[in-house]
Amino acid sequence: MATTLTLSEAVTALQQGDVIAYPTEAVWGLGCDPRQETAVHTLLNIKQRASGKGLILVTAELNTLQDWLDLDTLSPERLHEVQASWPGPHTWVLPASTRAPHWITGHHNGLAVRISAHPLVSALCRAWNMALISTSANVAGQPPARRREDLDPSLLPHLAGIVDGPTGGLAQPTSIRDARSGHILRL
């Protein structure tokens, strides 16, 4: 069984380029430091996920991502719609700046971002003072874990540990919408 981490221990693990598991709004997630390309590739290898798909970033404050975003290209109405939905279970694909790492955007020109209202996710991001990768804690193509005890045992040896707590109780993973068009990409 993987080690249970305090928030402080989780921050240390993230700083060291490790991958952690933590509960999100609906399912358990895997996370790492989005600034460390090696950490992101480790996470993708654990999940057996293609790198071109792009990844979601979860944060407590949008300003942690200001260098990677080009919000000036959004209309005031679209930006207001995005900001009014946060914090909450809504992921938006925002226009990425040229500084956004390709290992996060994949083959896309946007950055998928959620400002979470989940107390543990928000506390982790605040303690970390940065966004973190948020992808479901499962091997690609397999169902995501809704409870800690449902985490795939094959993932556990590759994790620095688990930040324990309940999921937010949503029936489905968060919706994903394109902030530029308003189109729903995932319900």
From Swiss-Prot:
It is found in: Cytoplasm. It comes from the Bacteria. Keywords: ATP-binding, Cytoplasm, Nucleotide-binding, Nucleotidyltransferase, Transferase, tRNA processing. Residues 4-187 form the YrdC-like domain. Its main location: cytoplasm. Gene3D superfamilies: DHBP synthase. SUPFAM superfamilies: YrdC/RibB. One of its GO terms (cellular component) is cytoplasm. It catalyses: L-threonine + hydrogencarbonate + ATP = L-threonylcarbamoyladenylate + diphosphate + H2O. It is an enzyme of class 2 (transferase). PROSITE patterns: YRDC. The keyword Cytoplasm applies. Transmembrane segments: none annotated. Its EC number is 2.7.7.87. One of its GO terms (biological process) is tRNA threonylcarbamoyladenosine modification. Required for the formation of a threonylcarbamoyl group on adenosine at position 37 (t(6)A37) in tRNAs that read codons beginning with adenine. Catalyzes the conversion of L-threonine, HCO(3)(-)/CO(2) and ATP to give threonylcarbamoyl-AMP (TC-AMP) as the acyladenylate intermediate, with the release of diphosphate. HAMAP family: TsaC. Belongs to the SUA5 family. TsaC subfamily. This is Threonylcarbamoyl-AMP synthase. The lineage of its organism: Bacteria, Pseudomonadati, Pseudomonadota, Gammaproteobacteria, Lysobacterales.
